[in-house]
């Protein structure tokens, strides 16, 4: 019913998604479906994994939606081992996520180094599809399959690994409850 262009662009020295345009295009797509005579009973949002946004106490976005293709995560894996004693073998055993330099944990640690003020101001962490859901229905939640790509979710518990999050000095309270795919949000 509806298609639109999407890509990353350089903002504030980083490769970023135009998240506001993406959100607007989702709404335009829903309007196009309605205009074509379709009335969806439900909406599911599927995007690339690993990318996220932070929101403040008023639900406003903090900073840019930096894309996984950005170079900010260079060397972060090595820094986790050097500075936190977190070997890749231990990390993998906890989360079951293979090493990809763009996994969310490395993005968060790069953000912690570059913009600690953003993490300090954050009240919510939402993966990109979770953020789009939040804009549509006002419910903040982290969907499990996408959250698992953060390398911060326990492979056994299928929930946030609180000890790992604390070890890395990330604010635990920003992570929303994890919901399974297909959970009705609003």
Specify the residue positions occupied by each region the protein language model found.
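N-terminal glycine/serine-rich phosphate-binding loop of ATP-dependent small-molecule kinases
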Residues: 1-64, 93, 121, 176-177
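Carbohydrate-associated surface elements
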Residues: 70
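Gly/Ser-rich phosphate-binding catalytic loop and adjacent alpha/beta segment
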Residues: 73, 86, 97-101
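Gly/Ser/Thr-rich active-site cleft segment
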Residues: 91-186
């Amino acid at each position: 019913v509806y298609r639109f262009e999407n890509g990353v662009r350089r903002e504030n020295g980083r490769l970023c998604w135009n998240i506001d345009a993406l959100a607007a295009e989702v709404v335009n797509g829903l309007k196009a479906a309605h205009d074509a005579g379709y009335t969806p009973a439900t909406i599911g949002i599927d995007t690339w994994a690993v990318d996220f946004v932070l929101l403040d106490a008023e639900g406003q976005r903090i900073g840019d939606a930096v894309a996984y293709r950005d170079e900010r995560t260079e060397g972060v894996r090595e820094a986790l081992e050097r500075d936190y004693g977190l070997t890749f073998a231990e990390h993998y055993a906890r989360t079951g996520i293979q090493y990809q330099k763009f996994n969310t944990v490395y993005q968060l640690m790069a953000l912690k180094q570059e913009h600690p003020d953003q993490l300090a101001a954050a009240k919510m962490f939402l993966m990109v599809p979770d953020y789009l859901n939040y804009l549509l229905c006002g419910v903040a939640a982290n969907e499990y399959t996408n959250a698992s790509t953060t390398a911060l979710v326990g492979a056994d518990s299928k929930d946030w690994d609180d000890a790992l999050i604390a070890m890395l000095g990330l604010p635990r309270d920003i992570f929303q409850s994890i919901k399974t795919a297909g959970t009705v949000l609003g």
